[in-house]
Amino acid sequence: MSKIGRKSKIALIVVFCIVFCVGIVAGAMAGVATKAIDNQKPDEFLRSWMSYVSDDTLLTDIVIPGSHDSGTTKMMWAAKTQDKSIKEQMACGARYFDIRPQLKDGKLVVFHGPITGEDVEPIIDDIKQFLTANPSETLILDFQHFMSDETAIEKTYALLSDKLDGLMVANKTELSDLDFVKSLTLADTRGKAIVFFGNVFKNTTNCDYINGKNYLFQRNGDSDTRQGSGLQSFYDGSLNRKSSKKYLANAIPKYVDAFENSEGGLFVMQMQLTDPIAIIGPKFYEGTHDENATRFISSLPGKDYFGRVNIIMRDFVGAEKCRQIIALNKDKGTIANDKLSEFASKCA
């Protein structure tokens, strides 16, 4: 055999081995990623679970399932954090939504990093339909980031004013927005959405655009607290990029401490991991995290900070993940006494 022929054969063997190894790794990663998916079917209880909560319960005391980067179901794998539409997530019991609008070709679309996805308007239509059909429920809409320029904020505001007129919680009192949010009971908010806006480009300044609009409330930045914010949600990329166990052991206590040192209000406990290289994608990392996160959530009633647990935000939310979070309301004491037994059976 000639040297050229021998080299060609070796090269083919090397290529085959590389392809084989890549296939093995890809298959293993795909297997891990499937663990992220919640395939449990929703039921009527999940659609109206807030009907079991006492009217006089403060909104800040209810344990609420939420979704991270809620409108990403149609995005490519690197940006996709949900496999269900917001309409489907609402049916599964989620009541907090992280919606990030960007102006693209004159239309508002959802973005996650550099990737864009579905139109915002149909999402708002679904929210209106859900609130109208389910007057016992309350939604928390967190428009925490905007892309493009201030036009994206203006168009989002106009869209909400048009579509959700009469369905948004409004501060018509003499209270500051922060004190107003802290005072809200479920009776005050049933059948409505409470809407929070973040800043346009940076997390360091107050969101001045909400001034004079009594149904827009300010939320904090990822790493700081904007003065007067009614929603606190903390994020440190260096922590969220850790392994699942390190994240739960180190990040959650830090975020709880940050909330305790804040002015208060609604508290979003971020339960998702971040892809450290932005290539593998959220689905794989949620697959490595789901079992640990589920176990951690089950342990929350035994934590000394359980009283502060409010909104728990996850990737790839579905009926099973939401039901587990909703069930914590029994331990929180937020369920009406005459509905407690039925609630417990629905969560079992």
Residue ranges and their predicted role:
Residues 2-36, 40:
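Alpha-helical transmembrane segments in eukaryotic/viral proteins
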Residues 27-94, 105-133, 137-138, 201-205, ...:
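Long, acidic (Asp/Glu-rich), low-complexity accessory segments flanking structured domains
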Residues 89, 100, 141, 195, ...:
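Conserved, mostly hydrophobic/aromatic
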Residues 103, 145-147, 201:
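Active-site-proximal loop/turn and secondary-structure-junction residues that shape catalytic pockets
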Residues 119-123, 161-179:
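Acidic, His- and aromatic-enriched active-site or binding-groove loops in soluble protein domains
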Residues 135-150:
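Active-site groove signature of glycoside hydrolases
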Residues 153-163, 206-214, 283, 323-330:
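Short, aromatic/basic amphipathic alpha-helical patches
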Residues 170-304:
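Surface-exposed substrate-engagement region within the catalytic domains
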